[in-house]
């Protein structure tokens, strides 16, 4: 029996076709109403007010200023640290030999003290004095190459507390007050820094 002559088969086919058409119509309606389905989600969004946005912007600008201040402060600290390190390096170069030179000063004092003893016509003593004088000159020249200067004021020079150490004060009629009467011991300075002040007697 052919399907064309079967009413029941025709009815089933018709029902199936109607269901397919209904499904397609539902899909079309779904596409057409997509904007309507999205609308509730849009309505749920809350956009911040102008005042709120301005407040957030102000807080962000304040934070930026704080970070900028912290950066500038850190940069200044780094610059100061770098300068201090450079000064310390320069001091090491200029004054690194300070302790060695200080230890050599008693040697110079001993030679000077020996040369201040009364002269003698004895050939051996004279030869010894000449040797001491040459040694002292050599020592002073060597120290000078390393930035050492001798502090040796003359009588009558003004007393300078930065360079001189007053061992005593004496009243001398012909001397001006606060002037040097006598040098007891020479002083030394290294690159402008006093290692030992000259010891002097000052007029009062």
Swiss-Prot record:
GO biological process: protein folding
Alphabetical keyword list: Chaperone, Cytoplasm, Stress response
Organism for this UniProt entry: Coxiella burnetii (strain RSA 493 / Nine Mile phase I)
Family membership noted in the UniProt record: Belongs to the GrpE family.
UniProt region (Disordered), positions on chain: 1-55
CDD domains in the record: GrpE
GO MF annotation terms: adenyl-nucleotide exchange factor activity; protein homodimerization activity; protein-folding chaperone binding; unfolded protein binding
InterPro entries: GrpE, GrpE_coiled_coil, GrpE_head
Cytoplasm is among the record's keywords: yes
Compartments where located: Cytoplasm
Lineage: superkingdom: Bacteria
Subunit annotation: Homodimer.
Any Pfam family the entry gives: GrpE
Record-level GO cellular component terms: cytosol
Protein name listed in UniProt: Protein GrpE
């Amino acid at each position: 029996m052919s399907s064309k002559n079967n009413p029941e088969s025709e009815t089933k086919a018709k029902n199936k076709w109607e269901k397919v058409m209904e499904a397609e119509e539902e899909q079309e309606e779904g596409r057409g109403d997509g904007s309507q389905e999205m609308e509730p989600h849009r309505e749920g969004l809350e956009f911040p007010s102008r005042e709120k946005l301005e407040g957030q912007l102000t807080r962000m600008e304040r934070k930026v200023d704080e970070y900028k201040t912290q950066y500038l402060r850190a940069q200044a600290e780094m610059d100061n640290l770098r300068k201090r390190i450079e000064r310390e390096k320069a001091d090491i170069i200029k004054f690194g030999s300070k302790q060695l030179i200080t230890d050599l000063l008693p040697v110079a004092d001993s030679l000077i003290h020996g040369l201040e003893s009364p002269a003698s016509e004895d050939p051996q003593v004279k030869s010894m004095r000449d040797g001491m004088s040459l040694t002292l000159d050599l020592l002073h020249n060597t120290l000078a190459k390393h930035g050492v200067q001798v502090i040796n004021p003359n009588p009558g020079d003004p007393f300078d507390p930065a360079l001189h150490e007053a061992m005593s004060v004496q009243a001398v009629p012909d001397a001006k007050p606060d002037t040097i009467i006598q040098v007891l011991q020479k002083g030394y300075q290294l690159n402008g820094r006093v290692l030992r002040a000259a010891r002097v007697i000052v007029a009062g």
